[in-house]
Amino acid sequence: MITAEAASESTVPAVPGDTAATGVPEHEELVWPWKDAPIRELVQRIHQLQAERAQAFRRLEEGHRQYLSSGPPYDFPRYRSTVHEVTQVFAAASREVLAVEAELAGPRAQPLLASHVRSLQQLEETRLTTVALLQLMGTPELTGQEDSLQMHQLKMKVIKTMEAISEVLQDLRFDAESAE
């Protein structure tokens, strides 16, 4: 159940410190900066978010390499910190991608574009899960237990997922141009 207090926490004050006669801060809904943007700008934003995700994946890979080369004893707290930072980047990108999808599916009435964005999100989730599993399998604690065939299959899955992401991004760009 959503309480009045929880509901008030989901909005932002209209003017910081501004209160009505009742002493309750005035609130307005969060304003999404892309709400009235043309479709091509939404698509550009998706591409920007993909670039941010790519950078986060590079940071995750680098963090994992540093972890593996740090020991023994291994510097797990540093790696955990990197994973936490990267997770925040992925979560923020996912929230915004889902907001673009909702905008395209709802007010913009662009179900094809929305489906591309949904596919992109699902592929990125698959990629992240697979990369995380690969990193887990490559940890020193599991050295000697890894299955080289399974590792190869997971690496191929990452490659195929990345190819599918590229295709979806191309389809999104092409179909967005047709929609305008």
UniProtKB/Swiss-Prot annotation:
The annotated region (Disordered) lies at: 1-23
Q: Which domain of life is it from?
A: Eukaryota
Question: What InterPro entries does its record include?
Answer: REX1-B
Q: Which Pfam families does its entry note?
A: DNA_repr_REX1B
Tell me what this protein is called. Answer: Required for excision 1-B domain-containing protein
State the organism named in the record.
Answer: Bos taurus
